[in-house]
């Protein structure tokens, strides 16, 4: 890592720490920018449903490492890498190591679909439909130019009068670099006419809105206006899951949130998220999180009291 990259990384960590008013994730004066500060181990269990990625975004850990699980895939990322996310995904993001002396600090920057289209308009090569869909969640290496643009954006938190104009300029610059970067195709494909990702987005949106309900894969294929084989192939390529696995992840992560945040018993939670059988719910919950519902809640609440 070059000295300049390390200096920018350290500056970003100081900026995030200084502007973090409380533990956890918070919005900032820049509408598209949010920051996170964790001084203790953290599991996806907040009231704001942290398992949903609602807009195309990038995530940068400026101090520490975050562990991410999507489907059956698991990876960690930190400096000098960033994560690119293009659509709603049921993910688990965890911080295993953090302290008051060295908190885990991160940045999230969201992009509007219209901004992606604006930067791609007129570029026929960039808008060309690719035969193979790209995964909607990827990790890419940060270079000095992107870190510099991020630092300029985050510095605006100390200069609120400059935010209305300069934040838009810097955000567009960062988006341009992402689009032309290693995994820019993940964002390009969601706004490209005829791209399978455009149709998969419709399927994803339907499942997110109806995950508590029973549905057939044929219905999801009809929503996406795709054949069943095509839906299966592209859904798996983009989300790392089948439609039914995607639904199951949403159900179980919402169940985890309910168990932690509300005084409900396991049977009631199972019913709330769409399970008819509490036994099946407990079995699938244990398989996904590694603990039974009760043990998992006790473990997480114990961590919160550290």
Predicted regions and their residues:
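A short, N-terminal "cap"/entry segment at the start of jelly-roll beta-barrel domains
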Residues: 1-31, 47-48, 132-134
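N-terminal regulatory/effector-sensing and dimerization cores
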Residues: 27-128
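Hydrophobic/aromatic-rich alpha-helical bundle segments in the mid-to-C-terminal region
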Residues: 50, 158-164, 186-190
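Short, solvent-exposed positions on alpha-helices
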Residues: 75, 161-169, 218
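Aromatic/histidine-rich interaction motifs
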Residues: 121-148
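A short, Lys/Arg-enriched amphipathic alpha-helix from helix-turn-helix/homeodomain DNA-binding modules
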Residues: 140-155, 168-171, 175, 179, ...
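Basic/polar phosphate-binding segments, predominantly the helix-turn-helix DNA-binding elements
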Residues: 173, 177-183, 192, 208-210, ...
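Generic C-terminal helix-cap and adjacent flexible tail
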Residues: 298-306
């Amino acid at each position: 890592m070059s000295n300049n990259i390390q200096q920018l990384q350290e500056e970003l960590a100081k900026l995030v720490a200084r502007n973090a008013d409380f533990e956890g994730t918070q919005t900032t004066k820049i509408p598209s920018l949010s920051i996170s500060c964790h001084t203790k181990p953290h599991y996806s269990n907040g009231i704001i449903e942290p398992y949903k990625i609602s807009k195309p975004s990038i995530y940068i850990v400026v101090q520490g490492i975050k562990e991410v699980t999507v489907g059956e895939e698991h990876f960690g990322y930190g400096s000098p890498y960033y994560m690119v996310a293009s659509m709603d995904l049921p993910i688990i993001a965890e911080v295993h190591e953090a302290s008051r002396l060295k908190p885990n600090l991160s940045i999230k920057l969201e992009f509007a679909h219209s901004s992606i289209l604006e930067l791609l308009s007129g570029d026929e090569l960039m808008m060309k439909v690719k035969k193979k869909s790209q995964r909607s969640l990827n990790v890419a290496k940060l270079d000095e130019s992107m870190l510099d643009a991020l630092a300029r954006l985050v510095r605006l938190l100390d200069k609120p009068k400059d935010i209305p104009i300069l934040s838009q300029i810097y955000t567009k610059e960062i988006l341009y670099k992402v689009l032309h970067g290693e995994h820019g195709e993940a964002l390009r494909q969601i706004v490209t006419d005829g791209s399978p990702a455009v149709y998969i987005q419709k399927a994803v949106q339907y499942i997110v809105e109806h995950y508590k309900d029973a549905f057939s894969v044929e219905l999801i294929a009809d929503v996406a206006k795709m054949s069943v084989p095509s839906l299966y192939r592209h859904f798996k390529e983009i989300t790392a899951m089948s439609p039914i696995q995607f639904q199951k992840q949403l159900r179980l992560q919402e169940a985890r949130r309910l168990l932690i945040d509300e005084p409900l018993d396991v049977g009631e939670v199972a019913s709330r998220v769409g399970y008819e059988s509490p036994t099946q719910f407990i079995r699938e919950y244990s398989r996904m999180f590694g603990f039974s519902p009760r043990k998992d809640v006790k473990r997480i609440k114990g961590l919160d009291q550290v």
